[in-house]
């Protein structure tokens, strides 16, 4: 049964157990969903990334990144936009931290820009003192306002000099350079920051950048649908596996350095993965298809950091195109995360692909799967999707994904490192009566927070934090500024003015500290 977003009367009635089960989180008993419904100490925050918000690309000796070069070289692939100014977080972070306070959040996920610290990619070629100080000032301001930082070391902004020298993550030479940079950040900020992420979305970084050519550096083979004609270089079905392999080896070495860092004692480190959930389209053999695509989407990077090697299904399918880890690398990779970061947005139907051309390999042909937000004949859509939405809304997928990770990966600590609703308002983008009344985003957050609460309180999944994407509208990669994900609206034509959306008002109420729900009331929202 499909439930329309608009005109929906949403009734959220939540009954949690006040007593501890044999294992798992303890949830207070509440009648309505609020901050009070989550376990004691549960953190709520917002998330951003350096390239998407900072701007100031030519200040403080910052060097160019992969994405700076890409947006200038291929403007038609990013809506003719760039992030030279972005939302000017570099100069306005104090103002934006007050927006976080207004939301009643107590966490903030940020990323450090590698070329803002090492303009040319390596320490020996120079350190930007201003860049280093910027992150000190930002972290200090967060802590002064009782907001806990979660810091991502790499969020796709490879220094351009390393791209030019040896192809960035296409070369194993990236490993020592990344580890040097990561180790520098650990020792520089480790006494203030206790929560770290080495890499953001390795699946997206490798597949979108090096297999389908959708994101920087925009590499793919000519036979790839949609972007094949745009890609000037690349080798789909080969390069994404090389990139991820180097990334995983770099992660293991960086974690080894982190665990030896005296300043970092008591800290935690992980990777932010970006799996969707998948429902089987065909009943016969459907679950096998789902299991296979999950191996290729999340197991690709989570299996090595948990068990020390790639999923067997990937090794069988990809064969010699999938690099092999040495025994020493496997030993370092195994149990190399303290938590599993999850960026969840949407879900798909998965269907076995029987029409694979092995002469033109890609990640998708190796996975032997097709996935879409609707069935092949279009008769059934997964969840619901308003006309302006970037992705289908399917909160059940979040709960199912949490349970899957708990069961397959030995019940790890999980942090929701991103979750949010994106929309393209088209010609209504500057119509504030539309843009600020983002009821669909409010609905999305309500449904997903309810699903997350059920995963924690009923399924006993060990989720400890939730970070909303995003604090504010920003540069959304290939979509430029046309896709809005923020709970604060950015007026890109009027001094980057920040404006509160309806979702921000709702979230602020939801997160009010000490809020106790009325015993006789339930939450009704006219959407």
UniProtKB/Swiss-Prot annotation:
Its subcellular locations are: Endoplasmic reticulum lumen
Cited Pfam families: Glyco_hydro_1 (PF00232)
Where can the motif Prevents secretion from ER be found? 524-527
| Bridged cysteine pairs (disulfide) | 220-231
| Gene Ontology cellular component annotations, sorted alphabetically | cytosol; endoplasmic reticulum lumen
Q: What class of enzyme is it?
A: hydrolase
Q: Where is it mainly found?
A: endoplasmic reticulum
Transmembrane region(s): none
GO-annotated biological processes: carbohydrate metabolic process
Query: Which EC number(s) does UniProt give?
Result: 3.2.1.21
What molecular functions are annotated in GO for this chain?
Answer: beta-glucosidase activity
Q: Which residues form the signal peptide?
A: 1-21
User: Which residues carry out catalysis?
Assistant: 201, 418
Q: Keyword Glycoprotein on this protein?
A: yes
Q: Give the sugar-modified residues.
A: 183, 462, 495
Positions of a beta-D-glucoside binding: 52, 155, 200-201, 345, 418, 469, 476-477, 485
Arranged from A to Z, the UniProt key words for this protein are: Disulfide bond, Endoplasmic reticulum, Glycoprotein, Glycosidase, Hydrolase, Signal
- Which reactions fall under this protein's catalytic activity? Hydrolysis of terminal, non-reducing beta-D-glucosyl residues with release of beta-D-glucose
Q: Which PANTHER family does this entry report, sorted A to Z?
A: BETA-GLUCOSIDASE 19, GLYCOSYL HYDROLASE
The record's similarity note reads: Belongs to the glycosyl hydrolase 1 family.
Name of this protein: Beta-glucosidase 19
């Amino acid at each position: 049964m499909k439930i329309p977003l608009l005109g929906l009367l949403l009734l959220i009635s939540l009954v949690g157990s006040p007593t501890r089960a044999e294992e798992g989180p303890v949830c207070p008993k509440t009648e309505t969903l609020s901050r009070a419904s989550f376990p004691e100490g549960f953190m709520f925050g917002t998330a951003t990334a350096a390239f998407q918000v900072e701007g100031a690309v030519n200040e403080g000796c910052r060097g160019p990144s992969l994405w700076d070069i890409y947006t200038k070289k291929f403007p038609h692939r990013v809506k003719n936009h760039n992030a030279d100014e972005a939302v000017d977080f570099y100069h306005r972070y104090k103002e934006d931290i007050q927006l976080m306070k207004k939301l009643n959040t107590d966490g903030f996920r940020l990323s450090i820009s590698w070329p803002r610290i090492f303009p040319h990619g390596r320490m020996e070629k120079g350190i930007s003192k201003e860049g280093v100080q910027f992150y000190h000032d930002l972290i200090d301001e967060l802590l002064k306002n009782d907001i806990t930082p979660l810091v991502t070391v790499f969020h796709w902004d490879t220094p351009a000099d390393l791209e030019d020298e040896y192809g960035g993550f296409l070369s194993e030479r990236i490993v020592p350079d990344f580890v040097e940079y990561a180790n520098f950040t650990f020792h520089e900020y480790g006494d203030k920051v206790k929560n770290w992420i080495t890499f953001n979305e390795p699946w997206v970084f490798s597949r979108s950048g090096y297999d389908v050519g959708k994101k920087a550096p925009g590499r793919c083979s000519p036979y790839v649908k949609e972007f094949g004609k745009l890609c000037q270089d690349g080798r789909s079905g080969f390069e994404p596996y090389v990139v991820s392999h180097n990334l995983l080896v770099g992660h293991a070495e960086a974690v080894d350095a982190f665990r030896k860092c005296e300043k970092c004692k008591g800290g935690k480190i992980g990777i932010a993965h970006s799996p969707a959930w998948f429902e089987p389209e065909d009943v016969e053999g459907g679950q096998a298809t789902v299991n296979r695509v999950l191996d290729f989407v999340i197991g690709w990077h989570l299996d090595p950091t948990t068990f020390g090697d790639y999923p067997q299904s990937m090794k069988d399918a990809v064969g010699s195109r999938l690099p092999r880890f040495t025994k020493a690398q496997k030993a370092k990779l195994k149990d190399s995360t303290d938590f599993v970061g999850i960026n969840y947005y949407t879900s798909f139907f998965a269907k076995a692909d029987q029409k694979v051309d092995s002469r033109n390999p890609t990640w998708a042909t190796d996975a032997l799967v097709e996935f879409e937000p609707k069935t092949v004949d279009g008769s059934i859509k997964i969840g619901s999707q308003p006309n302006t939405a970037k992705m289908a809304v399917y909160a059940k997928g979040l709960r199912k994904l949490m349970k899957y990770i708990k069961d397959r990966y030995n019940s790890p600590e999980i942090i929701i490192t991103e979750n949010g609703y994106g929309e393209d308002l088209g010609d209504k983008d500057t119509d504030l009566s539309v843009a600020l009344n983002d009821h669909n985003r409010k609905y999305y957050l309500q449904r997903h927070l309810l699903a997350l609460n059920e995963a924690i309180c009923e399924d006993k999944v060990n989720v400890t934090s939730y970070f909303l994407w995003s604090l504010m509208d920003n540069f959304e990669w290939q979509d430029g500024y046309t896709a809005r994900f923020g709970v604060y609206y950015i007026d890109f034509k009027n001094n980057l003015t920040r404006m509160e959306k309806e979702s921000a008002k709702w979230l602020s109420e939801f997160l009010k500290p000490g809020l106790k729900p009325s015993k006789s009331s339930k939450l009704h929202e006219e959407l």
